[in-house]
Amino acid sequence: MRQAWRWFGPEAGVPLDAVRQAGATDIVSALHEVPIGQEWTSAQIVERKNLIESTPTGRHPLTWSVVESIPVSDDIKRSGKAARHDIGAWIASMEALARNDIKVICYNFMPVVDWCRTDLDYITSTGATAMRFDQDRFAAFDLHILQRKGAEKDYSEEDRIAARAIFEAMDETEIEQLIVNIASALPGSTTEPLTIPAFREKLETYASIDAAHLRRNLVEFLEAVTPVADSLGVKLTLHPDDPPRSLFGLPRIASTEADYAAIFAAVPAQSNGMCFCTGSLGVRADNDLPAIARRFASRIHFSHLRATTREGDGRTFHEAAHLEGDVDMVGILRILLEEDRKRDAGQTIIFRSDHGHRMMDDLEKKVTPGYPVIGRMRGLAELRGIITALDACALEYDPNV
């Protein structure tokens, strides 16, 4: 397994030497500046690749090995008028990446909103801060700020009472911050920042699309792109929904083991794989992460390793330290390592320590939400320690125990 680091480019304030010092060898990056639906050119890719891979004397090299993500446009997700054009641009971007030896591509199929949190600086018991999804605050946004048509039917009376109490206690600053957190697109999102009116309009464009319809559109997309990916040796890795359930009445179709099984059955192409994100899938108590990893091991080409802690009835959660929370990280790494040992060197699983607590010096710095250096470095070191220990006792390990 190869250790990677998500890098948002030189503007994000994380020098590549910091990545080296964290112990990573591979970079996960993307051309976030290119508008959704527009083709990535070879010149743009080469410029970013050279920036990453030009190695100063005496430094160890870094390799741009994973793209996260080429955005999938709303027209593709809705099978809209521009779907054919946007799929063509997506394929052209994939071909340009493959020509530059970047052959693992992460993407998602979440409509309107990408990954979603209500609180970007939840204070933990150590004084570090973490990201959190508070179900009641989310409901307050949906019911009283967004005022989504028909939202009431998605919440129980108890939920509605709690949401109103939270909303009535919020001042204007808190309301604006919640809008920013939910509607303005978190770092790495493949959806666009939205004003409240634009948010409502975008939701209306999905009014006639249920889960079965969205899944058909995903299958149509994969049927178009996987033959090209297979011919190029590219691996496509579908990221789970985050959180893995419906938001705003929208369908989500990559939330469970059954969801992925249906996708792989519909499009069994070798290039059709998954990004195994333990933090996203782990939010659901009914997702057995080791079982999912074991079942789909051959299709896992990229992994986000992080943990979450469910609160109350499980709909509220916060991001835990990497070896804490509700994720059996040791058990999962055992399965991934077992799979990785079966593979040729060029097909190794690439992973990154996903997200991280904001701690120590990072508490005083402007950081990319979810992606502070120190918290991610700590997580990567902890994961590396598990891998080193498991490798050392590999001959003694029985995966059936």
Swiss-Prot record:
GO molecular function: ferrous iron binding; manganese ion binding; mannonate dehydratase activity
Family, per entry: Belongs to the mannonate dehydratase family.
Protein name (Swiss-Prot/TrEMBL): Mannonate dehydratase
Protein role: Catalyzes the dehydration of D-mannonate.
Organism superkingdom: Bacteria
Required cofactor(s): Fe(2+); Mn(2+)
Pfam families: UxuA
Gene designation per UniProt: uxuA
Enzyme Commission code(s) on record: 4.2.1.8
Gene3D superfamilies membership: Divalent-metal-dependent TIM barrel enzymes (3.20.20.150)
InterPro entries (UniProt xref): Man_deHydtase (IPR004628), Xyl_isomerase-like_sf (IPR036237)
The UniProt record lists the keyword Manganese: yes
Pathway: Carbohydrate metabolism; pentose and glucuronate interconversion
